[in-house]
Amino acid sequence: MSQGVEFNRLMLDMRAMQADAMSLPKVTAAPELAPGQSTFADMLGQAIGKVHETQQASTQLANAFEIGKSGVDLTDVMIASQKASVSMQAMTQVRNKLVQAYQDIMQMPV
């Protein structure tokens, strides 16, 4: 008799949970972006492009200095090199934070 009562109570609890779940609003898709708005992926891609441009400019300036092109100063080469280095380090840190955030989300219990 006790098992029958527990089973009935379990069924009532399940029906109550089902009714609660059915009353919740449905999940909707992500809202559409307005024209001119950028996604995170777009911004990240632009940042990577800027880092690449900085490195290319640094390399070109260093090559121009090495061949003795006039108007290219050693200080300009060193500043461009440091800018490229700092931008690469910053991009690496952003990548590390993104990977860590992804791992944290994947380890969350569902």
Curated annotation (Swiss-Prot):
InterPro entries associated with the record: FliE
Gene Ontology BP annotations: bacterial-type flagellum-dependent cell motility
Alphabetical keyword list: Bacterial flagellum
Location of the protein in the cell: Bacterial flagellum basal body
GO MF entries: cytoskeletal motor activity; structural molecule activity
Superkingdom as given in the UniProt entry: Bacteria
GO CC, alphabetical: bacterial-type flagellum basal body
PANTHER family assigned: FLAGELLAR HOOK-BASAL BODY COMPLEX PROTEIN FLIE, PTHR34653
Record-stated family: Belongs to the FliE family.
NCBIfam families named among the record's database cross-references: fliE
The protein's name: Flagellar hook-basal body complex protein FliE
Organism, as annotated: Pseudomonas putida (strain ATCC 47054 / DSM 6125 / CFBP 8728 / NCIMB 11950 / KT2440)
Gene name per UniProt: fliE
